[in-house]
Structures are given as structure tokens and as C-alpha cells.
Regions:
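Extended alpha-helical targeting/anchoring segments
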Residues: 1-483
Length: 483
């Protein structure tokens, strides 16, 4: 059955630029992974976005897409938009250019459709803040360079509804010639159904590590970075900062098998796999950067870390130590305040609230203290404003944020790129959900990169901070090795 009907869409078509048309099929013989393989057989540009609760219960939806109709990327103020034609130009405000594109795709929401029905999928790099804070002078000294923003526009979506055991196929159509476009959408939905049910699956190219992972900082060097950070804290420049350590190895093949391992060993609230012509990224992020659903903003600060115990008894003992650790609580509270401040920039007066505070969440190798901050977005702001307000997260930079970013840029050896940035989607209807780019790997030009960091405050012990970076990188590195 095709929904909505043409008659239903005709009633509302004058209010919108595009409308979604969908078809449901059974999902009993397909999985997100084998559908992804079918998509990879016909397109080098694909994505898979999934979610798992921390108790290992899978979220309701998995979203897949291929063959974007537009690609949007910007690096060092040089912006490119690739569609039927390609344009490249210089800009100081890529957000404005992205907004112009999204404004051409105003779409309604239907209760029977999933949370994402089409829009932009991709990432905003950590260094994207250079456009909202021009005084930050990021020099691009990295041997392999990542775009400041890289987004793909998908007007077709394949959504697995794991609760109803169905696949929802979605095609977005323009409203200017509705009946013609509706009939075309029916044909495209049937073609999508055939692709999902019978499409030839691309073989999974084995990912191969061709060298051991090498850290940018030795343990001693990283401990020195921690001490230098603490010197800035003692001078009163900052209260906290989050230095990081990049590991890299020579690599060939695909990260898809590593993603399959992550799905089993480290299910997390944000599971993602994205592939482009010259880049692949995958990860299992525990942390929302910012989420906007029907006017409600949310962010979920995570700060305060302990390793997982060997058994339930040790887990509970570690949890008790963590929740009573003054240093970890002070670090967490600072970042909750920073999250409130970020949302406060674009929220209605007195609407920002901490709705969950000091909750322990367990993941495969570590446990964290988590909180939830919510606010109601002001009508003059949108999803892109929310990303600009929150990026990069205080949990990946520090407090005060701008001074912490300046210090980290001085102390770290390479730009962060996607690490500490935002990964996810911006929906045609105005909603958005992006996670922080952590617990992830990026493969590009024969290298694979894994980066991790930890919050440093005045009482931090340098050796412990180095070990925290090891613990946080462990699940991703193990997934690559097992794949």
C-alpha cells in the first residue's frame, strides 16, 4: 500500500516544496547489513544509521541511503555543491549556503512515518567552529586533510522498523507537478522494493591492518600535555580541557566488517557507517551533540569515566567509586553547565532544564556519568543554529569553550577533523539528530585513524588520563583487528 494517497497530498501540497511517499514491505528475510551490501553494489556513496540502548536493546529504526542527489562540502572557506552541475566558490558562512539548500525542501511530517524521511546526512568537523568564531586560527597541518563539513542530500530512504518487523521505503517528490511525480514515485518505490528484496550484494572487502597502530603522543608526551593543560588551569585561563591522542595505522579494504563487529560488541546510542568515494567512517558513539525534534532541543553531556569491571560485583564497585569521585563529578558538572549555556543561546527564556542528572551508563569497555539537558528552540532559530551553538561539545573541548579550544590547538599535533565533530542527519521537516564524533574510525588514503581524549582538571593524574585515552579507543581498535 502506498501512503499518503494522492488526494491527501493534494490537500497540503501548496504549503510544501516536497512531500514523502512511502511503501511498506516485510523485513523478515533482510537485515540492514545485507541491504547495505546491495546498495554498495550500485553506489560508492552509502550510509547506515542505527541506534542501540545502553542495555543492548536495539532502537526502533535503522536508516539507509545511497546515490545522493547533492553533495555539499567545504574546506578552508572553499565550498563545493555537486548535483546535476557543480559549483565551487569562497564563503565565510557555509551554514548560510546549507540553509539556502534546505529551504528549497520544506516537507511535512506524518505520524505514520519514521523520525527521518530524507534530508542531509554526513558530518560537521570539529574545526567547523572556525566559521562561527573567526578569531580561531586553525592551520591545516595534517598529512591527510578532512573537509570542515561534508553532507549528502538523500531524497530516498530505506528505514527498517524493528518493532513492526517492516521496511519503510520513502521517496520524496516535488509538489509542482504532483500527479506526475506521484506516479513516478510509485515506480521508484517498486524498484526500491526489488532492490531490497533481490538486489545483488556487493562482496565485503576485508579490512586489513598493514601496520600496528602508532600514537601521535607517547605516554610520556601525553602526560606532559596534561601537565601543560593543568598549568593553564592554575593560571586561571580555563577550568578544564579535553586533550586527545590520535592513533593511525596503514590500512586497506573496507571498515564495514569493523562496523559489524561494533554492532555485536559495543552497541551504542549512535551506530554509524558512511562511505564516500575516498573516505569511510564508522563508529559507536555514546553521546548526542544536539537533537531537535518538533521544537524540543536536547543534549546529553557525558563526562566522568571508569573502566568496566570483570563481573557485575566489580562493575558495581567501580560505579560506586565513580559516582562519589569529587574530581569526576566536578568535571561533569562543569560540562552540564556548558551544555545549558549552549542550548540557552537559542532556547526560549526559562525553558532550559536539566531533566536527568548524574546517571551511570555502561558501555563495552567503560562506564560514564551522564545527564540530560533540554530546551525549547526559539522560532527564529533552526537545526543549523543548534549545531553552531553546540559544536564542538564542551565534553570534547573544555570550559570556557573558546579558550580551551585555543589551548588544545596549541598542544595537539594535528587538527581533529571529524573527531569531536557532529555526525548524523538534518531532516527535510526541520528535525535533526547528530552525535559527537567519538569511538570511531576514519579510513582515507591507505590509513585508518582512531582518536580519543579525556577531560583534564586541576586534580587530574597524568598517568590516569593517558590510560583513559587507551580505554576509550580500545573498542574501536579491537573491532578493526577482529574484522
Amino acid at each position: 500500500m502506498i501512503k499518503p494517497s494522492l488526494i491527501e497530498l493534494e490537500r497540503i501540497s501548496d504549503k510544501y516544496d516536497i512531500v514523502p511517499v512511502c511503501k511498506e514491505i516485510f523485513s523478515d528475510i533482510r537485515t540492514p547489513i545485507n541491504v547495505l551490501r546491495a546498495l554498495k553494489h550500485i553506489s560508492s556513496t552509502t550510509y547506515l544509521l542505527e541506534s542501540a540502548e545502553t542495555n543492548e536493546k536495539w532502537g526502533r529504526y535503522s536508516f539507509l541511503g545511497f546515490n545522493p542527489s547533492l553533495e555539499i562540502f567545504c574546506k578552508n572557506h572553499q565550498m563545493t555543491i555537486k548535483g546535476a552541475m557543480t559549483s565551487t566558490f569562497t564563503t565565510d558562512n557555509p551554514t548560510k549556503e546549507i540553509r539556502k539548500i534546505l529551504q528549497q525542501y520544506k516537507s511535512p511530517r506524518f505520524d505514520f512515518l519514521p523520525t527521518f524521511t530524507g534530508g542531509l546526512v554526513g558530518y560537521f568537523a570539529y574545526e567547523y567552529i572556525r566559521y562561527s568564531e573567526p578569531k580561531l586560527d586553525f592551520k591545516d597541518v595534517e598529512d591527510i586533510s578532512f573537509n570542515d563539513v561534508d553532507l549528502m542530500l538523500f531524497d530516498k530512504v530505506i528505514a527498517f522498523d524493528h518493532y513492526k518487523k517492516k521496511i519503510i521505503l520513502i521517496v520524496n517528490i516535488k509538489t509542482n507537478d504532483l500527479e506526475k511525480n506521484y506516479n513516478k514515485a510509485i515506480r521508484e518505490l517498486n524498484e526500491l522494493a526489488d532492490l531490497v528484496a533481490k538486489g545483488q550484494q556487493a562482496p565485503i572487502t576485508e579490512g586489513k591492518l598493514l601496520s600496528e597502530f602508532k600514537s601521535e603522543f607517547t605516554p610520556e608526551e601525553y602526560e606532559d600535555v596534561v601537565r601543560k593543560t593543568q598549568a593553564y588551569i592554575k593560571e586561571g585561563d580555563i577550568f578544564q580541557a579535553v586533550p586527545s591522542n590520535r592513533k593511525q595505522a596503514d590500512f586497506s579494504g573496507s571498515l564495514l566488517n569493523a562496523y559489524r563487529v561494533l554492532r555485536t560488541t559495543n552497541p551504542s546510542p549512535y551506530m554509524f557507517y558512511l562511505s564516500g568515494k575516498d573516505i569511510e567512517l564508522t563508529g559507536a558513539s555514546p553521546e548526542t551533540l544536539v537533537k531537535l525534534q518538533n521544537g524540543l532541543l536536547e543534549t546529553f553531556p557525558i563526562a566522568g569515566t571508569m573502566p568496566r569491571g570483570k563481573n557485575e560485583l566489580e562493575d558495581k564497585a567501580f560505579e560506586d567509586i565513580l559516582i562519589h569521585d569529587d574530581k569526576e563529578l566536578a568535571e561533569h558538572n562543569m560540562l552540564v553547565d556548558l551544555g545549558r549555556n549552549d542550548l540557552g543561546k537559542i532556547s526560549e527564556f526559562n525553558s532550559v532544564k536539566v531533566t536527568s542528572f548524574h546517571k551511570i551508563e555502561r558501555f563495552s569497555h567503560v562506564m560514564h556519568i551522564t545527564s540530560t539537558v533540554q530546551g525549547k528552540i526559539r522560532p527564529e532559530f533552526d537545526a543549523l543554529d543548534a549545531i553552531n551553538a553546540a559544536l564542538p561539545a564542551g565534553t570534547l573541548s573544555g570550559a570556557p569553550k573558546i579558550r580551551a579550544i585555543e589551548i588544545l590547538h596549541e598542544l595537539e599535533k594535528s587538527p581533529r577533523g571529524i573527531y569531536g565533530g557532529a555526525i548524523g542527519y538534518l531532516d527535510f521537516s526541520g528535525n535533526m539528530d547528530v552525535c559527537i564524533g567519538i569511538r570511531m574510525a576514519v579510513a582515507k588514503q591507505g590509513k585508518v585513524f582512531v582518536r580519543s581524549g579525556g577531560g583534564v582538571v586541576k586534580d587530574s593524574i597524568p598517568q590516569n588520563e593517558y590510560q583513559e585515552t587507551v580505554n576509550k579507543a580500545q573498542s574501536m581498535i579491537e573491532a578493526i583487528k577482529k574484522a
